[in-house]
Amino acid sequence: MLIFVKSGENMLESILKNTSEIVSIEELTELLKKEEKIAYIGFEPSGRIHMGHYLQIRKMIDLQKAGFKIVILLADLHAYLNQKGTMDEVRALGEENRKVFEAMGLVADYVYGSEFQLKDEYTIDVYKLALSTTLNRARRSMEVIAREDENPKVASVVYPLMQVNDIKHLNADVAVGGMEQRKIHMLSREILPSMGYKAPVCIHNPVLTGLDGEGKMSSSKGNFIAVDDDEATIKKKMKNAFCPMKEVSGNPVLEIAKYYLKYPATVKRPEKFGGDLVLESYEALENAFVEGLHPMDVKNLVSEQLIEILRPIREKMNK
């Protein structure tokens, strides 16, 4: 696959698009000047890859086009510590996830955590990190990620230290993740320099709300659109999605419209309901919705575009 590398301001503009936060833009700008640079993201192997994952993968593709070598950590050992299944189960899921990422068009080095996280050098560094991190700081960094548990395991404290250590051992210049990763990434910027390693640039992407409007989109909750869902499934899920009239905040349908749809976009309606409506931007869509555009009109628009956006992935997965 050919990768067309962008240059100058176009690279930075592409990376900035649809991000929630970059720490820091100045450091990223300097990093873009280097010939060799690595960007990494870690994924706990998951049952289905959904639109929330796709938001992250698209950012990795932006970084790839900006000249970064991309490393995808298939975090099998992390998943095990986070009680997602046996090592064999999460490894099998990891292989399925890798195939989907490749179908998305991402060219990357895929690394399983268990390939390096059980080595002596890695383990010693985890001990060093443990000496540099208070118990409260480690636990706070996991609050958003770990499953709620009335009796948290010691593993929930080891997990963030391992994630910080991954950045060092993968030689990453940039760490990418959703906003739920922010506390761990900030921990890495604080303590890695004390071990003689650079503080990574951290790129945080939005976390999509689940289709039920409750919490984040998650394969374990079933409130997602998978990137390989067929047309009928996409339409059904979107039809049933939470989309309260005139409400923008926490609206999963509008979030998908914001981050995925191409504009100008046309809402197709019968003449008796006002006829077709051309929207030049997401802001125009949001304004129309607040002013009374029917949720089903928005859902139909999103379904129509999602089907086309995901078509190449479905076709590759079905070969």
UniProtKB/Swiss-Prot annotation:
Its EC number is 6.1.1.1. GO terms for biological process: tyrosyl-tRNA aminoacylation. Signal peptide: none annotated. L-tyrosine binds at residues 40, 159, 163, 166, 181. Keywords: Aminoacyl-tRNA synthetase, ATP-binding, Cytoplasm, Ligase, Nucleotide-binding, Protein biosynthesis. It is found in: Cytoplasm. Gene3D superfamilies: HUPs (3.40.50.620), Tyrosyl-Transfer RNA Synthetase (1.10.240.10). A motif ('HIGH' region) lies at residues 45-53. ATP binds at residue 219. PROSITE patterns: AA_TRNA_LIGASE_I. Pfam families: tRNA-synt_1b (PF00579). One of its GO terms (cellular component) is cytoplasm. It catalyses: tRNA(Tyr) + L-tyrosine + ATP = L-tyrosyl-tRNA(Tyr) + AMP + diphosphate + H(+). InterPro entries: aa-tRNA-synth_I_CS, aa-tRNA-synth_Ic, Rossmann-like_a/b/a_fold, Tyr-tRNA-ligase, Tyr-tRNA-ligase_3, Tyr-tRNA-ligase_arc/euk-type, Tyr-tRNA_synthase. A motif ('KMSKS' region) lies at residues 216-220. Catalyzes the attachment of tyrosine to tRNA(Tyr) in a two-step reaction: tyrosine is first activated by ATP to form Tyr-AMP and then transferred to the acceptor end of tRNA(Tyr). Homodimer. HAMAP family: Tyr_tRNA_synth_type3. This is Tyrosine--tRNA ligase. It comes from Methanococcus maripaludis (strain DSM 14266 / JCM 13030 / NBRC 101832 / S2 / LL).
